[in-house]
């Protein structure tokens, strides 16, 4: 993974404030596990409301977790005072997301002035085992 220098010295506060103010982030129960330049990890509880059978997480919340993880990682490298908008994201489901804990990790792979691209991965864990359940790419546009 490349090493990045944040353009906003207060990037961590900006990421927390912006993401945690979003109603869907609040509803999903996302909480930050790690925020570093170009990297963000979220934890999301697995609740019956986001599953299709009471156990396995439905694809929509998995895609949202990837989008938020990659987008937040991108936001760590954005200049102060700008916003980011998702212009593209892909989701590849790899395994059923079953467990009691769900984690998303976003890692920036390219950071330009107008576009930032991040890889996003999702993992489910339960009973001491963690498996990767999805992967994707997220492209964000910097909006002044």
What is each stretch, according to the model?
Residues 26-28, 38-40, 83-89, 100, ...:
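A generic structural signal for short beta-strands and their flanking turns/coil linkers
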Residues 3-9, 96-144:
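HotDog/MaoC-like acyl-thioester-processing domains
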